[in-house]
């Protein structure tokens, strides 16, 4: 049985305990759960587990290579005895202590570990909140076990035991436990670890044993109320940003500081350290415990219900993936990783209010359409491909109708604007359907050409025709170059004129979108216009990949890249095209 399968089997136990903690807290008037926070924490755990299918190869592979080369005492008989198992577990916990401590005292390790601390709640769902990048460097701290001769199988088992033990200590409903607190990581000890109080900061690192903290001077007793989270709150339900936030800050500081030594020190100094030049220009504000505010955008009951249903479906999808992941080809596993990641991101965006439910459904349907095409699941593909555009059409219709009912009189709510976009989407829907069947390439090409003409007309509203000559020259140049490649790469003579017409029209569509963004950029609609322009660029990229694969040479995973870029284009256009506050 694989580690992923063990996690799947343990998941029902996790949720039973979470449910019991929730009921207990409600009954005692001390509920420690919030829906969005719990979904976000568990979602980050899902993302951690599905990405571990790939990153685990790094950790286990390096460990096995070192063990095979330099193990000093590789006696399997000893290590699989009760004394060997116990020693290996203590050895692992000792290494974990130093990894965990580095995760708080060295910025690059904190960038990975911070995910576990971002929740401002402390409950059993917080235990499942795990990083997706910890394996990139964490393996370094366990190499002493490989050198000592702990077999990889024993290492894997004790690592899982150490991880599972730490689940139960993430609760506010278990008080101090007397002698147990003096030896082991307990709820009281670990509450201190998660707190941002000054006296609690960077304390109690032990995974199973807290004696390491007592030995190395990092122990702190719980003696005042804990405030949870990080000193620089994430303030987001975005699982991708949760993993990238600190890395982005380190990259920015490393790039902006003038001194070459500081460009390295940024990564190895304690979290929050700033080079002198950056600290002088942009000093970090002092942390004030009494100013901490809990992040929690309001949600309607409909959104809460949507979130619960989506979460349940994603949980089932993640469980199915983890159960079979080790038997899947790497490319196939990567496709499903992309689907689940996109869906987790969309769910977080809905819960935060950054995206509507229809937009999230469009993204999820697009991801499934892409995956089913790439993996040859034709029957399912023929459902999800048209469904994606149907959802987009419904979204545009309802968005425009609600904006109009709300009394907005800007150009984005004009009837013509709505119908032009709807006509473009209907044409794209027809093109999608045609291209699902052999022998209908020309009808599909014509349908998309019509769709681009409607998009051009929609992008024209509120701005001049083709307002940027530079954009026009760029898109026509790219289109002309691609057409030349197709011509010499084997484009059939019967398709040369239709494809030429299509290339010109899509280049004009992209040029109009880019020019529109240039005109609107200084105003409130500039960001949305830029989203439309980027979407138009992805449209050109998608069609280029499709044409190269069809007429020049087969490309690896072509269907995945064609549809991934196509749906990225449609999502960006659909989400942004009606957001334009400039007056008509």
Per-segment meaning from a language model:
Residues 121, 172-310, 347-348:
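Cytosolic/stromal cytosol-facing helical appendages immediately following the last transmembrane segment
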Residues 1-5, 27, 68-72, 323-327, ...:
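Short, hydrophobic transmembrane alpha-helix segments
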Residues 15-23, 90-105, 160-175, 186-192, ...:
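Transmembrane alpha-helical segments that form the membrane-embedded catalytic/substrate-channel core
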Residues 297-356:
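Substrate-recognition/cap regions that form aromatic- and gly/pro-loop-enriched pockets
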Residues 19-39, 376-384:
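Membrane-interface helix-loop junction between the first two transmembrane segments
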Residues 357-584:
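Polytopic alpha-helical membrane-helix bundles and their juxtamembrane interface segments
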Residues 3, 147-157, 325-328, 376-378, ...:
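Transmembrane helix interruption/hinge and helix-loop junction motifs
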Residues 46-58, 79-233:
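Membrane-embedded catalytic scaffold of the fatty acid hydroxylase/desaturase
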């Amino acid at each position: 049985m694989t580690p992923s399968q063990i996690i799947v089997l343990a998941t029902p136990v996790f949720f039973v305990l979470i449910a019991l903690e929730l009921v207990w807290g409600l009954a005692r008037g001390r509920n420690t759960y919030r829906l969005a926070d719990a979904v976000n924490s568990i979602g980050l755990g899902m993302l951690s587990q599905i990405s571990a299918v790939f990153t685990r190869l790094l950790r286990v592979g390096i460990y096995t290579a070192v063990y095979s080369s330099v193990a000093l005492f590789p006696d399997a008989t000893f290590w699989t005895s009760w004394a060997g198992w116990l020693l290996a577990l203590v050895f692992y916990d000792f290494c974990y202590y130093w990894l965990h401590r580095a995760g708080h005292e060295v910025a690059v390790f904190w960038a990975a570990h911070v995910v576990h601390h971002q929740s401002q709640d402390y409950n059993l769902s917080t235990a499942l909140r795990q990083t997706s990048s910890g394996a990139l460097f964490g393996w370094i701290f366990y190499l002493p076990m490989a050198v000592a001769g702990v077999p990889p199988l024993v290492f894997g088992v004790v690592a899982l035991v150490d991880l599972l033990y730490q689940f139960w200590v993430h609760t506010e409903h278990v008080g101090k436990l007397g002698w147990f607190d003096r030896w082991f990581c307990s709820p009281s000890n670990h509450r201190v670890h998660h707190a941002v109080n000054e006296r609690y900061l960077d304390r109690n690192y032990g995974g199973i044993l807290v004696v390491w903290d007592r030995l190395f001077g990092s122990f702190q007793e719980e003696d005042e109320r804990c405030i949870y989270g990080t000193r620089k709150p994430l303030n987001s339900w975005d699982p991708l940003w949760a993993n990238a936030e600190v890395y982005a800050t380190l990259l920015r500081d490393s790039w902006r500081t003038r001194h070459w030594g500081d460009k390295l020190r940024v990564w190895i100094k304690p979290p929050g350290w700033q080079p002198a030049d950056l600290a002088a220009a942009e000093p970090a504000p002092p942390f004030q415990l009494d100013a901490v505010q809990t992040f929690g955008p309001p949600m309607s009951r409909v959104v809460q219900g949507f979130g619960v249903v989506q979460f349940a479906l994603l949980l089932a999808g993640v469980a199915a993936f983890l159960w079979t992941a080790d038997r899947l080809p790497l490319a196939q596993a990567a496709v499903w990783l992309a689907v689940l990641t996109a869906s987790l991101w969309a769910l977080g965006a809905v819960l935060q209010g950054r995206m509507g439910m229809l937009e999230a459904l469009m993204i999820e349907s697009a991801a499934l359409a892409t995956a089913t095409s790439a993996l040859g699941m034709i029957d399912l593909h023929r459902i999800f491909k048209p469904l994606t555009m149907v959802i987009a059409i419904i979204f545009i219709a309802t968005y425009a109708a609600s904006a109009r009912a709300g009394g907005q009189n800007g150009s984005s709510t004009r009837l013509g604007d709505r119908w032009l976009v709807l006509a473009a989407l209907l044409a794209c829907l027809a093109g999608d359907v045609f291209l699902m069947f052999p022998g209908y390439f020309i009808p599909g090409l014509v349908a998309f050409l019509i769709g681009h003409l409607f998009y051009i007309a929609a992008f024209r509203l509120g701005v001049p025709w083709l307002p940027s000559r530079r954009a026009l020259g760029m898109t026509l140049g790219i289109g002309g170059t691609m057409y030349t490649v197709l011509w010499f790469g084997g484009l059939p003579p019967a398709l040369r004129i239709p494809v030429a017409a299509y290339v010109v029209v899509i280049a004009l569509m992209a040029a109009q979108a880019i020019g529109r963004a240039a005109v609107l950029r200084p105003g409130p609609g500039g960001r949305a216009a830029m989203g439309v322009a980027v979407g138009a660029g992805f449209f050109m990229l998608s069609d280029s990949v499709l044409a190269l694969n069809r007429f020049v040479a087969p490309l690896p995973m072509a269907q995945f890249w064609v549809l991934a870029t196509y749906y990225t284009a449609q999502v960006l256009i659909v989400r942004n095209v009606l957001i334009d506050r400039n007056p008509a």
